[in-house]
Structures are given as structure tokens and as C-alpha cells.
């Protein structure tokens, strides 16, 4: 499904490639990111460059994403995380008020902790000045070490087997 196509609300599974580019800058392509809509859940796989913008272009507010899955930690799969995470908290991004679920291979905790440290002052100022709810920046982390296995640790009624 391309970004310009309307969604079929009767579909059980909709996959949208938000970015298929590489680390090399290309004005026509964003970096790696895939949106999966399944069983009324919005699942995001990787956060390449431009992911938040592509979500908005696809008609999805970043705050609508229920869970984020990192496949691995190459820059073209992660560089858009800060923009997506903090942008989903802002009113223009949907105003996230609940924690974001994030899963990934070993190392996901360090990735998230680094972002929390890097943006601590920004978060503090937005809470104080814009009265944004701090809960919208919270992240629930699940790490795994099994190669080729995808799962959603927060919703037991949705299994995501790798194929």
C-alpha cells in the first residue's frame, strides 16, 4: 500500500512502507520504517529518518502508535526515534498521554536511556511551559534475544510470528 492510497477499513492486516531508503540521503525516500495495522493496533517497525512525517502523510498521528519494534540498531532504522517519540507527545502529533511500548533486541534499554538523557531538558521545559503531561514521554521497554521472533509483550491477544 502506498502512502497515497486510502485505507480499507475492512482489512484485517494493512502494511504500509513508510520508508525504504538507505543511510544515503535521497529526496524521494525516507529511511526504514514499516507501519502494520492489525486487530485495531498500530505497530511501528523501526524509526528511520522521516518516520513521523510519513505517518502524518499516511493519516496516522504519531500518538496512535501502540507499540514500536526495533529490528536492529543501524542508524537508518533508529535515527527518527527522537522526532517520533517526542513529536507524538506534542499536540500536533496527537498528544500522547500514555506510555509508548518499545521492544527490541538486547541494547534497547541503552538506546532509550540515551534518548531520555539527551532530551531531559527539552521534556522538563515542555512540561513546565506547555503543561504537557509527563506520562506522554514514558516508555515501557521489552528486550529480547531471540533472532527471528516477533511478539507483542503488551497485548496477549495479538501474536506476530516472523516469516
Q: Where are each of the predicted segments found?
A:
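Binuclear metal-dependent hydrolase catalytic cores
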Residues: 1-163
Amino acid at each position: 500500500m502506498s502512502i497515497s492510497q486510502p485505507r480499507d477499513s475492512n482489512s484485517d492486516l494493512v502494511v504500509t512502507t513508510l520508508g525504504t531508503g538507505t543511510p544515503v540521503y535521497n529526496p524521494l525516500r525516507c529511511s526504514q520504517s514499516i507501519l502494520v495495522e492489525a486487530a485495531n493496533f498500530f505497530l511501528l517497525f523501526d524509526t528511520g529518518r522521516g518516520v513521523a512525517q510519513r505517518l502524518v502523510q499516511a493519516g496516522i498521528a504519531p500518538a496512535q502508535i501502540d507499540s514500536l519494534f526495533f529490528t536492529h540498531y543501524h542508524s537508518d532504522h533508529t535515527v527518527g526515534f527522537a522526532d517520533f517519540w517526542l513529536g507524538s507527545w506534542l499536540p500536533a502529533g496527537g498528544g500522547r498521554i500514555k506510555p509508548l511500548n518499545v521492544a527490541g533486541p538486547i541494547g534497547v534499554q541503552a538506546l532509550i536511556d540515551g534518548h531520555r538523557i539527551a532530551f531531559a531538558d527539552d521534556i522538563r521545559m515542555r512540561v513546565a511551559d506547555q503543561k504537557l503531561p509527563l506520562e506522554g514521554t514514558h516508555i515501557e521497554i521489552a528486550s529480547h534475544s531471540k533472532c527471528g521472533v516477533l511478539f507483542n509483550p503488551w497485548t496477549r491477544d495479538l501474536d506476530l510470528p516472523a516469516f
